[in-house]
Amino acid sequence: MLRGIFHICLLASFLLLPFSSAVHDSGFTGGTDAPPPWDHNVSPPPETAPSPTPTSSPSTTSPPSPGPVAAPSPINNGSVSGDMTWWCNKTPHAETCNYYFRKSSQNNINLRPPRFRSEFLRMLVKVALDQAVITHSQTVKFGPSCTNNQRKAAWSDCVNLFQNTVAQLNRTLKGLNPAASSDVKCTDFDAQTWLSTAQTNIETCRSGSEDLNVSDFVMPVISNKNLSDLIGNCLAVNGVLMKQHDHTTTANHKEYFPSWVSRHERRLLVSASLAKSSPHLVVAQDRSGHFRSIQAAINFAARRRFKSRFVIYVKKGVYRENIDVGNDNHNIMLVGDGERKTIITSGRSVQHGYTTYNSATGGFGGQRFVAKDMTFINTAGPLRGQAVAVRSSSDLSVFYRVGIHGFQDTLYIHSQRQFFRECYISGTIDFIFGNAAVVFQNCMILVRRPLHGQANIITAQGRGDPFQNTGITIHSSRIIAASDLKPVIRAYKTYLGRPWQAYSRVTIMKTYIDNSISPLGWSPWLRGSNFALNTVFYGEYKNFGPGSSTRWRVRWKGFHAITSTAVASRFTVGSLIAGGSWLPATGVPFKSGL
């Protein structure tokens, strides 16, 4: 009974967040390598960064060199200057590369040395795919050894994550085939995204086992860095190929729709009223729809034969359930009656025995997922640690006019390409975290009151490889204290971010920053730690408001007070997520450039 009262009170506290400070009333307008760092000559005031509760410990292995590793030049005359060893020695993980190609040779597999980088890349992806299949199979075999719920939870995540790694590598290999059909063929930007996801899945398996203190259980699999190194080699070689092309997209979203989007689907995506009037399914608690449960509707959609856009209209109400859109359930669109009317809520957390990954109120995996006009809440509360409201690993996904509320680890932007427009996001510690390539545009980011002795950290970006084309951009948005923090704003430190992984990348541009943010701006992972301070990329460009001054910001090599339009443009919708090529199909407004 007490738990029920607590749940209702906590839900009410989320709904009392300052929705009235609407983004559109705030005077808003409307994968790249990190640029060379530069130093700042102004000393910050004497202030010690706090020791906030970490989401996960940083990797204890030595990170690879942050500088680009040159892949071999293409050999146009058809000959090679050596054998596979010559090619492998050009990669960042040469020993691993040589080992697996020697192994193939010993197994009587005839390997002809490649003539071009692109051929070598396909060979690398094939080797990584073969190893991923083996790793997945080994992980599945751990199932009978799951003697408690914690092990079962970590094992289940790892099985699904390695299965997805196999899928991402297989998708990449097919897409890189010169003979692939147009609907399968991929760009090198696509490939870099999928390879980044494949590698991120491995790290997520590891961190999930640490969440529940069962890392010894899956250690035989996750301690083997070979698969991660093989994918890292793919990222490095494909990264060189990416530099030969410009993936910035500037298409006018009012004029462009991809050819695969039908005329009806275009109208459906652009018009919220049309989506409500002619959905494929309706969810309603008053029995006026097809289902009373959102998950039941999602499960029904997963069984459909054709994977075109499928609209589920969720009528107003509070839905107490966890929902999950599987990795193979593509083109799902959830449309509600508004942020304050359609509410999905649950209270899973790590302290309840869930991994961070699986604690999400809403988890989304299928490609091109869209959510509009609804709110997701994790009601676990500040005492329960990591508790996710939304987790997205959906490629080309969009969240439009969506509320996402919690405390620690509110929004898990896990992987792939994502876009958030006019969303409200609230939390305390690391409440926007993960390793997607993601842009937040015209969003309201609300910093809540943490527990006594804690500090607020807005972002914890998880880029663990210098060639991953991932990062967080907050553009034309507002970063402000929520109503529960405002009266005690001076009692708590708040930072824009801290480095979850060695190459963490966050850029904040043309955004209002209030006085809740510490003058230092950014925090180390732990108090006194030097982890990743020279290899991160934390950039600020033309922000405004009382907390926006970069005069007293940290003096790390990885911090950049950006003054160049060319540098800032690398982190826009058009560049970081190549949004001009896919966002028009969603019907959601966006600004491609600065």
UniProtKB/Swiss-Prot annotation:
What top-tier enzyme class does this entry carry? hydrolase
- Residue ranges annotated as compositionally biased, kind Pro residues, are 34-71
Tell me which UniProt keywords the record has, alphabetically.
Answer: Aspartyl esterase, Cell wall, Cell wall biogenesis/degradation, Disulfide bond, Glycoprotein, Hydrolase, Secreted, Signal
Intrachain disulfide bonds:
C423-C443
What InterPro entries would the database entry show?
A: Invertase/methylesterase_inhib, Pectin_lyas_fold, Pectin_lyase_fold/virulence, Pectinesterase_Asp_AS, Pectinesterase_cat, Pectinesterase_inhib_dom
Signal sequence residues = 1-22
Which locations, inside or outside the cell, does it occupy?
Answer: Secreted, Cell wall
Q: What is its EC number?
A: 3.1.1.11
Region Pectinesterase 33: list its residue ranges: 280-581
- Give the sugar-modified residues: N77, N170, N213, N226
Q: Which reaction(s) does its UniProt entry say it catalyses? A: [(1->4)-alpha-D-galacturonosyl methyl ester](n) + n H2O = [(1->4)-alpha-D-galacturonosyl](n) + n methanol + n H(+)
Q: Does the keyword Secreted apply?
A: yes
* Tissue specificity of this protein: Expressed in siliques.
Mind telling me which Pfam families this protein's record contains? Pectinesterase (PF01095), PMEI (PF04043)
Catalytic residue positions: D409 (proton donor), D430 (nucleophile)
Give the family, as the similarity comment puts it.
Answer: In the N-terminal section; belongs to the PMEI family. In the C-terminal section; belongs to the pectinesterase family.
Share any extra remarks.
Answer: The PMEI region may act as an autoinhibitory domain and prevent untimely PME activity during transport.
Give the protein name, as stated in the record. Probable pectinesterase/pectinesterase inhibitor 33
